[in-house]
């Protein structure tokens, strides 16, 4: 990540560490020229009348620009660069972000078409994790991805449709929103819909139309401090887009979501899966949750946090596992096994 705070302060983030560069821009005019070149190359406009812009570069990097008068200390530009090759689950395991046991478990949930939400704070690695998780989607399915700025790098799926939202032009026309794209995607005969991130009223269509309308296995991400906070934020975002009693919205969310994976960025700057939570349903006036895995910190070693993603409970909602061909005996016996007529015998997860 490259953070340019005016002409004199340029910060770089690499491997989770932020440090200040010794590079400088010679003048505000030069910095503004660079910003205009980048914006024009991405077919975007930015000026004092419209001082904020988000854009995607040809190499996939994401750019955010804020100009005066909004940026009080001069032009601000943040560039997030992505690796040429998507991060894999194996890499996340090697980095200590998640355990092999939890990965095996999540792999089977994806194959069994559980609706999964990835939550976490800014910079916690939600998109990276969602991308790695999507590698377990069967390659013969039709997948539609929907994003504000295209970041997902799904590989190996030939029947893949990638959609990206578009801002309005200078006349305030021509905008294509995430909500527009979800509605369109529902007419494209998708097996699964993956929304990079929900931030507003598009949550109504993601929850009510996609996840509850025959598109099991859909996935998305959202900003939250913990799984319960994610549910509250989803409630708020749905209320932005539809007039329904809160209880009806809570019931829809409880029916739509199966599992929430919560990520965090710890004080040593590492990114880890902190909790995997099952959504049990709506009961006693609230959405009921059950923790399946939780990260237990065990101390520091060489400046790094050590710990284990501990299993706390068995998954309760097993209907999709059974529909995917995993045996009830295997589930109750402490492992998930797929019936022989489906192949992949003896997959040990639970």
Where do the protein language model's features map onto the residues?
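Conserved P-loop NTPase nucleotide-binding/switch module
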Residues: 147, 154-157, 185-281
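P-loop NTP-binding catalytic core
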Residues: 4, 9-112
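P-loop NTPase switch/communication element
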Residues: 83-94, 131, 135-183, 230-234
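Walker A (P-loop) ATP-phosphate-binding motif of ABC ATPase nucleotide-binding domains
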Residues: 115
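Hydrophobic anchor at the beta1->P-loop junction of P-loop NTPases
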Residues: 118
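NTP-binding/hydrolysis catalytic cores, primarily Walker-type P-loop NTPases
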Residues: 269-350
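Walker A (P-loop) phosphate-binding loop of P-loop NTPases
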Residues: 123
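Conserved lysine of the Walker
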Residues: 126
């Amino acid at each position: 990540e490259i953070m340019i705070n005016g002409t004199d302060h340029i910060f770089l983030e690499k491997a989770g560490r932020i440090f200040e560069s010794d590079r400088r821009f010679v003048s505000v005019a030069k910095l503004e020229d660079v910003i205009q070149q980048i914006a024009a190359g991405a077919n975007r406009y930015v000026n004092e009348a419209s001082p904020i812009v988000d854009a995607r570069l040809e190499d996939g990097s994401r750019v955010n620009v804020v100009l005066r008068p909004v940026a009080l200390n001069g032009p601000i530009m943040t560039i997030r660069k992505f690796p040429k090759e998507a991060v894999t689950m194996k890499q996340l395991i090697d980095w200590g972000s998640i355990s092999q046991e939890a990965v095996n478990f999540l792999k089977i949930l994806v194959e069994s078409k559980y609706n999964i939400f990835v939550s976490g704070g800014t910079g916690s690695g939600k998109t990276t994790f969602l991308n790695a998780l999507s590698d377990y989607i069967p390659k013969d399915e039709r997948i539609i991805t929907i994003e504000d700025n295209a970041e997902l790098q799904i590989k190996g799926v030939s029947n893949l449709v990638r959609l990206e939202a578009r801002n309005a032009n200078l006349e305030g026309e021509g905008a294509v929103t995430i909500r527009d794209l979800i509605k369109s995607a529902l007419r494209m005969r998708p097996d699964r819909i993956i929304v990079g991130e929900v931030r507003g009223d598009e949550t109504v269509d993601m929850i009510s139309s996609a996840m509850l309308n025959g598109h099991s296995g859909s996935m998305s991400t959202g900003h939250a401090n913990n799984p319960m906070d994610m549910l509250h934020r989803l409630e708020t975002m749905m209320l932005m887009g539809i007039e329904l009693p809160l209880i009806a919205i809570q019931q829809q969310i409880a029916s739509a979501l199966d599992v929430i994976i919560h990520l965090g960025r710890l004080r040593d700057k590492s990114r880890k899966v902190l909790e995997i939570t099952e959504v049990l349903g709506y009961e006693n006036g609230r959405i009921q949750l059950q923790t399946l895995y939780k990260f237990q910190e065990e101390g520091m070693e060489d400046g790094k946090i050590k710990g284990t993603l501990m299993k706390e409970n068995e998954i309760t909602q097993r209907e999709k596992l059974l529909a995917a061909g995993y045996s009830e005996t295997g589930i109750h016996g402490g492992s998930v096994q797929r019936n022989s007529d489906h192949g992949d015998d003896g997959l040990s997860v639970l």
